[in-house]
């Protein structure tokens, strides 16, 4: 993604969807560059998990000062704006 508003992602109800594993890796690495870490795991553990269990139905959000994921229905039911990363 060429332009992404990281401040808006951190402050608003936004979920990000990645269509590919490469897009997922890119998004997560950009999160790290913007000081966004996972809520419950180390960086290496999380990337390893995502590589082994890739799911194109996974959406990411920033909540309670950390990165989390869930299914699309979780976010759409709660009124999140969904942005396509790749």
Please report, for each region that a protein language model flagged, where it lies by residue.
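Structural boundary micro-motifs
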Residues: 1-86
């Amino acid at each position: 993604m060429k332009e992404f508003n990281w401040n808006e992602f951190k402050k608003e109800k936004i979920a990000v969807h990645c269509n590919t594993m490469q897009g997922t890796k890119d998004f997560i690495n950009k999160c790290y560059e913007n000081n966004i870490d996972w809520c419950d795991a180390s960086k290496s553990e999380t990337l390893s998990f995502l590589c082994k269990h890739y799911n194109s139905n996974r959406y990411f959000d920033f909540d309670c000062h950390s990165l989390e994921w869930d299914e699309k229905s979780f976010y759409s039911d709660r009124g999140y704006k969904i942005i396509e990363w790749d």
